[in-house]
């Protein structure tokens, strides 16, 4: 009898151990797809939650955008997305989700369309990248199960994409968002520091079509408020003023949003601390209230 019991216990332990070993998250940081819109190959990275390979269910998705000078590996290498997402899911603060990190390291202002330069990155994102990853991976369809976040330049992209397509995102969480000025001359001077050249007309069109302060003036309040907003910037960040003005503009417009200012600057230490809060915030939208 003891031998039978011992054998049964060992069998159960083996099954449990196997499940623990197999139920691990995975990150793929060098995935590729061909873009007809951009006429080039583009890279992206994906985080798959721990139970992805042991289940058959579909998952919500977070699009996570990097900043200027980084690529699709930034959030993996410096942002420690795997470790942070694993811990948030394990602790029950975040629901299991797929995280998609595109590469916008293109030598241009990454996330925007620039028609005069025949550069249509935003079209690529919505018309090629999103349909590709959402068909390749088991991602739940619909606005309710889709969120977007990003840091610095990616924070600016987060704002613009969510405002351009409020029908697609349930939540948007810009971190230390690089919004810049709405003034054309000031914006031209600012962007020269990064070695990027624009004509005055190009900058004028870019600001009119993409700057969040300009976009919210044209939009219906109901469309903007169909998105849950989380704005976060450190008190020592050089973009603190821009983000504060964004918060004020949102408040004056009547846009419901969370605004967080914590101790910190424009660096990965701050964004690593922000990511668990973002995962928790978007997860609340993925669940039913």
Where do the language-model regions lie?
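Bacterial Sec-dependent N-terminal signal peptides
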Residues: 1-26
């Amino acid at each position: 009898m003891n031998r039978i019991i011992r054998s049964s216990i060992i069998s159960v332990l083996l099954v449990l151990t196997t499940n623990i070993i197999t139920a691990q998250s995975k990150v793929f940081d060098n995935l590729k797809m061909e873009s007809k819109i951009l006429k080039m190959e583009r890279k992206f990275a994906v985080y798959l939650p721990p139970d992805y390979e042991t289940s058959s269910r579909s998952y919500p998705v977070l699009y996570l955008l990097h900043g200027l000078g980084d690529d699709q590996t930034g959030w993996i290498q410096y942002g420690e997305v795997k470790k942070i997402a694993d811990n948030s899911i394990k602790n029950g603060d975040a629901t299991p989700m797929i995280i998609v990190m595109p590469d916008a390291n293109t030598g241009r202002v990454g996330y925007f369309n620039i028609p005069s330069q025949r550069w249509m990155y935003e079209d690529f994102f919505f018309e090629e990248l999103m349909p590709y990853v959402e068909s390749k991976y088991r991602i739940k369809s619909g606005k309710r199960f889709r969120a977007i976040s990003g840091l610095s330049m990616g924070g600016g992209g987060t704002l613009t994409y969510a405002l351009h397509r409020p029908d697609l995102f349930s939540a948007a969480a810009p971190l230390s968002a690089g919004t810049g000025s709405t003034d054309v001359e000031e914006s031209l001077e600012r962007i020269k520091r990064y070695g990027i050249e624009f004509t005055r007309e190009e900058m004028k069109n870019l600001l009119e079509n993409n700057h969040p302060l300009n976009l919210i003036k044209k939009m219906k309040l109901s469309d903007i408020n169909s998105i849950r907003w989380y704005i976060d910037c450190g008190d020592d960040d050089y973009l603190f003023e821009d983000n504060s003005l964004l918060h004020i503009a949102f408040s004056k417009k009547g846009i419901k949003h969370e605004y967080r200012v914590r101790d910190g600057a424009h660096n990965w230490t701050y964004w690593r601390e922000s990511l668990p809060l973002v995962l928790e915030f978007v997860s609340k939208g993925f669940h039913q209230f």
